[in-house]
Amino acid sequence: MFRQEQPLAEGSFAPMGSLQPDAGNSSWNGTEAPGGGTRATPYSLQVTLTLVCLAGLLMLFTVFGNVLVIIAVFTSRALKAPQNLFLVSLASADILVATLVIPFSLANEVMGYWYFGKVWCEIYLALDVLFCTSSIVHLCAISLDRYWSITQAIEYNLKRTPRRIKAIIVTVWVISAVISFPPLISIEKKGAGGGQQPAEPSCKINDQKWYVISSSIGSFFAPCLIMILVYVRIYQIAKRRTRVPPSRRGPDACSAPPGGADRRPNGLGPERGAGTAGAEAEPLPTQLNGAPGEPAPTRPRDGDALDLEESSSSEHAERPQGPGKPERGPRAKGKTKASQVKPGDSLPRRGPGAAGPGASGSGQGEERAGGAKASRWRGRQNREKRFTFVLAVVIGVFVVCWFPFFFTYTLIAVGCPVPYQLFNFFFWFGYCNSSLNPVIYTIFNHDFRRAFKKILCRGDRKRIV
């Protein structure tokens, strides 16, 4: 990613980063005093300490948050869905950024020169691009996974196995490596002509136009465009499904499977255990992103854990189903469906306000079913607003963290001057995305919050499980 300004050997590799001599630029890289005296640092002691503290907090928060994500996925029963392996791989990339990249970037920044030699300069910058690119491509893969689970519904969810998810993750890393490593493959011949003696070596970003443009497109602009288009499409589908009430929705509106059962808004099939006909076969209220709004099955569904809103959890399985929803299983033994009551019969053992003749009972049942549909309809409208906000957070944080860096990076390559301080700020601001990913993809999810409580509050573990 970086150009070798000062030739070190005949036939050397064109590196990702350049270990170049930089004489007389004390504001950027520091200088060496005549006679081998003390090096001048680019910042005062107070500023240096502030930068070290801020970068240290960034590294700690990134490692801590992403380690929590990995532990939660592997220890929580509610997070065993195969697609959560995306979050494990994403968290691993962010941890590697915080441990193998940021410390050396910090040292280079506060010391004013590259201390660690040419070989590690190339490795460090290759890893920098690899991990940051893989983090971005992971977000893109997650958005595509959500889109396929909506548009292909049953077919994709049947194919969404751990093996398939792992194959996609490997593909993500291969794409990131292809974007990151081409300069290490090309060999650039340079003469061994004389030049000025090295003063302060520095590891700088590659300014070769072909690589800057290609890496910027592959690392940011293309994944960003894909994410935006995919999330816009997800929002359009969710909005269309909630705009039409369930009672007016045709068989093609939600791609209902045979039998008339509606699919859940996230594209999954009907709720497990719902086997009765008519109003009783209506799926339970669900949120736009696939998480249930009221009762939830004991076993987490594939589409829930990765979603960004509230999701199912085992402690909600015993929650009452509310009016208009007959209980299923053993607890429904004493209940008689209105559709089974013959004309002239009365419902057994009902209270004073219960239905009398079969026609009245059937009418009340239909009225209760209609009220339940209206309630679900209003709930979906409210959840649409929350889902829109979550999508705005996902896309907004991604763009805000990375767009300034890649935009100025491209401007420099085409010859537009950019102040070093501004570019350096954008360079560090991009690292913040690695620490924010756990917040975006976990804090909005109820199962992750409960898993974090289980991890951090061991005394309360039995109740949380």
Swiss-Prot record:
Highest taxon above the source species: Eukaryota
Pfam families: 7tm_1 (PF00001)
Omega-N-methylarginine, modified sites: R368
Phosphoserine: modified positions: S346
UniProt biased composition (Basic and acidic residues): 313-330
Major localisation: membrane
Biased composition (Gly residues): 353-364
Mode of membrane association: Multi-pass membrane protein
Entry keywords, A to Z: Cell membrane, Disulfide bond, G-protein coupled receptor, Glycoprotein, Lipoprotein, Membrane, Methylation, Palmitate, Phosphoprotein, Receptor, Transducer, Transmembrane, Transmembrane helix
Transmembrane segments: 49-74, 86-111, 122-144, 165-188, 208-232, 390-414, 425-445
UniProt-listed GO biological process terms: adenylate cyclase-activating adrenergic receptor signaling pathway; adenylate cyclase-activating G protein-coupled receptor signaling pathway; adenylate cyclase-inhibiting adrenergic receptor signaling pathway; adenylate cyclase-inhibiting G protein-coupled receptor signaling pathway; adrenergic receptor signaling pathway; cellular response to hormone stimulus; DNA replication; fear response
Function per UniProt: Alpha-2 adrenergic receptors mediate the catecholamine-induced inhibition of adenylate cyclase through the action of G proteins.
Name of the protein in its database record: Alpha-2A adrenergic receptor
Lineage of source species: Eukaryota, Metazoa, Chordata, Craniata, Vertebrata
